[in-house]
């Protein structure tokens, strides 16, 4: 099967200019200057060292006096010493300047990751591209830093090559032609191997991602109990070994390609050197040059071959690094699907109440074969408490993502006060919502910072009030440093680990602290028992009177207090109405409610017998 190729978006020259702009933006214009100076110094070192012995022989051959020989030695040795000293100094001096440029790119990657739109953050192709971008900036040997070193090596080889070419102009034109043909062949071989690596970068990234995931889960302190209780170690080891074997197979395949490339390179180099020595010796035996010229040309042929190989090698390396920089640039330049800048301002509402309407909305995830939601017509009235219920996978969370503006519908429109939300600045639109999702993130920071989501201007009294409403007052009182206690142990050794239920209560406190006009709860209490869930939902019912609220749950009893309940089934609104109205109809909602009620009654009876 023919492999699908992916043409690089940028050429080598374009990426070099881009890196120059990055160095300038990082206030490190000295990086390219260092590279040029070192290239000149290293070229001077090689050329002066090559000329030293032939010039002495030429002086002796011409019968020059001792003073001339001594002066020749002094000049060439002096140039050699100065160039060597400059080269040695510049071997390490520019390192921190190159690191500064790379760190600036790392900051850009992190910023892009933090601010890119939600659809991009869930797109597998974007996540692969992100990993490749990180790989291009991960250490001192990566493309974004090593490029400067290899540019310097290429300049060194190119400058030296020109000098040695001029020295060999007195030799046979057939010699130069032979060198050109063999080196051109070597160039195309190296180009093919670089393109092979670029074509298989996605495969390598996928294997690396899988290995990182398995390793991360195996080291997780949060999952440590589950791994031990359920005896998951052999399974994790088996998955790790399987992934490692897949990586080994890929590396073996890659190294096999590299091996045969190196074999071809070696053959071409041997042919090139053999032809060079053949033409040079034939000209010498014919009496076309003296002893000094012979020694000079003899040395120049070896240096010429070495620098020609250097040009080809560095050109291949630069091309490979350019391909890695292409992935970095592609990630940083990913277009945003939303209006994150510009766009219309939100409509002003004195009472802070907004109407949300879904107009014939359908949504299909990228790569999916069927719609998750289809033909949804829904109006969330200002101040309404709306519940969305249904079985797992019915599309409840997707509906919330559309309301929040995390996704745009595949068909139809989402309207805010009658205007399409795609016309608004999406960052401003997000300020209308405070949400708690089933999957959440807790920062490695203090408790109060996790609630307030900031380090400055924290209202401590308000933080305590929100924690109390979320039912965490007693837990906070037991913490060693009260609100200053660190959460998590990945960064802080003195951090505490909260239980799953406590984490979700913390998320509720965070939502209360933001106090946005619209509240969305996407099954945040799923880890709690039904009684605890009902208790928290009842608290929210009391706290959100007159405030637009959307509650998502698969436990129908927890949302009875809502003004209206939607039952999502198969991606459509199957039923809607109040709890009492839906029970009276005797439809799907009533059936699900009866099944769940029966389950909890039986569970309660069993607990009582125990």
Role assignments for model-derived ranges:
Residues 130, 415, 473-506, 515, ...:
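ABC-fold ATPase nucleotide-binding domain signature/coupling loops
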Residues 404:
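Helix-to-loop junction immediately C-terminal to a conserved catalytic motif
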Residues 413-415, 430, 448-493, 537-538, ...:
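ABC ATPase nucleotide-binding domain helical subdomain, centered on the C-loop/LSGGQ "ABC signature"
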Residues 1-46, 61, 66-71, 90, ...:
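Membrane-integrated ABC transporters
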Residues 482, 538, 546, 555-610:
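C-terminal portion of ABC ATPase nucleotide-binding domains
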Residues 232, 276, 295-333:
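Cytosolic ends of transmembrane helices, especially the final helix of ABC transmembrane type-1 domains
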Residues 1-17, 99-145, 207-250, 322-335, ...:
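Extended non-transmembrane interhelical loops and adjacent amphipathic helices
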Residues 32-89, 165-197, 271-278, 282-292, ...:
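Transmembrane helix-loop-helix hairpins at lipid-water interfaces of multipass membrane proteins
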């Amino acid at each position: 099967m023919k492999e699908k190729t992916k043409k690089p978006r940028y050429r080598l020259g374009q990426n070099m200019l881009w890196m120059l702009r990055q160095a300038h933006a990082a206030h490190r214009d000295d990086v390219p200057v260092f590279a040029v100076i070192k290239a000149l110094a290293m070229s001077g070192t090689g050329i002066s060292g090559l000329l030293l012995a032939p010039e002495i022989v030429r002086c002796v051959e011409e019968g020059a006096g001792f003073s001339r020989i001594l002066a020749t030695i002094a000049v060439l040795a002096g140039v050699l010493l100065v160039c060597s000293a400059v080269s040695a100094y510049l071997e390490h001096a520019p390192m921190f300047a190159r690191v500064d440029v790379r760190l600036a790119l790392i900051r850009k990657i992190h910023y892009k990751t933090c601010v890119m739109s939600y659809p991009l953050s869930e797109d597998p192709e974007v996540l692969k591209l992100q990993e490749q971008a990180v790989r291009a900036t991960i250490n001192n040997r990566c493309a974004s830093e090593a490029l400067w070193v290899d540019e310097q090596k290429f300049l060194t080889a190119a400058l030296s090559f020109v000098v040695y070419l001029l020295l060999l102009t007195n030799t046979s034109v057939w010699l130069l032609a032979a060198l050109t043909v063999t080196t051109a062949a070597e160039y195309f071989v190296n180009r093919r191997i670089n393109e092979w690596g670029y074509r298989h970068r996605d495969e390598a990234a996928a294997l690396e991602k899988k290995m990182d995931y398995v390793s991360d889960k195996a080291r997780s302190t949060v999952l440590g109990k589950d791994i031990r209780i359920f005896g998951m170690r052999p399974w994790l080891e088996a998955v790790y070994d399987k992934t490692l074997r897949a990586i080994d197979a890929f590396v073996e395949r890659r190294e096999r390609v590299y091996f045969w490339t190196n074999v071809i390179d070696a053959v071409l180099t041997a042919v090139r050197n053999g032809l060079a020595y053949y033409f040079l010796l034939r000209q010498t035996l014919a009496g076309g040059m003296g002893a000094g010229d012979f020694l000079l040309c003899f040395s120049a042929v070896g240096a010429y071959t070495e620098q020609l190989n250097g040009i080809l090698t560095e050109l291949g390396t630069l091309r490979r690094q350019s391909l890695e920089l292409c992935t970095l640039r592609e990630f940083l330049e990913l277009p945003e699907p939303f209006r994150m800048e510009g766009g219309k301002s939100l409509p002003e509402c004195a009472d802070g109440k907004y109407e949300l309407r879904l107009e014939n909305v359908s949504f299909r995830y990228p790569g999916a074969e069927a719609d998750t939601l289809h033909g949804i017509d829904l109006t969330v009235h200002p101040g309404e408490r709306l519940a969305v219920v249904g079985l797992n996978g019915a599309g409840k969370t997707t509906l919330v993502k559309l309301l929040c503006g995390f996704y745009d519908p595949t068909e139809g429109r989402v309207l805010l006060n009658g205007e399409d939300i795609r016309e608004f600045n999406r960052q401003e639109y997000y300020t209308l919502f405070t949400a708690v999702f089933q999957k959440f993130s807790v920062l490695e920071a203090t408790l109060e910072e996790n609630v307030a989501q900031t380090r400055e201007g924290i209202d401590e009294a308000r933080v305590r009030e929100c924690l109390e409403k979320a039912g965490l007052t007693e837990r906070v009182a037991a913490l060693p440093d009260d609100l200053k206690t660190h959460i998590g142990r990945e960064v802080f050794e003195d951090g505490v680990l909260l239980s799953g239920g406590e984490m979700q209560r913390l998320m509720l406190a965070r939502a209360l602290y933001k106090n946005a006009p619209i509240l969305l709860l996407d099954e945040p209490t799923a880890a709690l028992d039904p009684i605890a869930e009902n208790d928290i939902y009842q608290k929210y019912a009391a706290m959100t009177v007159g405030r637009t609220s959307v509650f998502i749950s698969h436990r129908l009893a927890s949302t009875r207090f809502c003004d209206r309940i939607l039952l999502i089934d198969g991606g459509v609104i199957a039923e809607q109405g109040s709890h009492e109205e839906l029970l009276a109809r005797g439809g799907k909602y009533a059936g699900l409610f009866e099944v769940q009620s029966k389950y909890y009654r039986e569970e309660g009876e069993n607990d009582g017998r125990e």
